[in-house]
């Protein structure tokens, strides 16, 4: 019974992560740039290094190019999982909550100026 609850919570978490990431895909280039600058400022060194690696893998010169390519995939979360671990995806979700002025979550937000 406990394992079913854990699986249900994990599935619910994946839906929340996916929904927030799709919000990133709907942003204008300027909005996305602002959010990704904030991500870089607040991410761990390991996450920033991984994002640099993914930029190279996708032949992108910047994070905007990378996220636009990831957003162009039919399933954004599946595409993220090709490049990032679940832990890294969770960090990305936390960064999105922190940096997105339009996020509808009860987390503190970063509003870069």
Swiss-Prot record:
Signal peptide: 1-19
Predominant cellular place of this UniProt entry's protein: secreted
Keywords: Antibiotic, Antimicrobial, Copper, Disulfide bond, Fungicide, Immunity, Innate immunity, Metal-binding, Secreted, Signal
S-S bridge residues: 25-71, 38-99, 60-65
GO terms of molecular function: copper chaperone activity; iron ion binding; metal chelating activity
Gene Ontology biological process terms, A to Z: defense response to fungus; defense response to Gram-positive bacterium; innate immune response; killing of cells of another organism
Cell compartments where the protein resides: Secreted
Taxonomic superkingdom: Eukaryota
UniProt key word Signal: yes
GO CC term (a single one): extracellular region
Role of this protein: Has bacteriostatic activity against Gram-positive bacteria, but not against Gram-negative bacteria. Has fungistatic activity against some but not all fungi. Binds and sequesters copper and iron ions. Copper-chelating activity is crucial for antimicrobial activity against M.luteus.
Identification of the protein by name: Antimicrobial peptide microplusin
Organism of derivation: Argas monolakensis (Mono lake bird tick)
Lineage: Eukaryota, Metazoa, Ecdysozoa, Arthropoda, Chelicerata
């Amino acid at each position: 019974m406990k394992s079913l609850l854990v699986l249900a919570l994990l599935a619910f978490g994946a839906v929340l992560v996916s929904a927030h990431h799709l919000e990133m895909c709907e942003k204008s280039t300027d909005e996305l740039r602002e959010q990704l600058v904030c991500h870089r400022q607040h991410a761990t060194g390991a996450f920033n290094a991984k994002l640099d690696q993914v930029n190279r893998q996708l032949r992108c010169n910047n994070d905007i190019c990378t996220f636009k390519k990831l957003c162009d995939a039919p399933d954004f979360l599946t595409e993220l999982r090709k490049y990032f671990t679940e832990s890294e995806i969770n960090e990305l979700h936390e960064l999105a909550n922190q940096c997105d002025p339009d996020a509808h979550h009860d987390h503190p937000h970063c509003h870069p100026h």
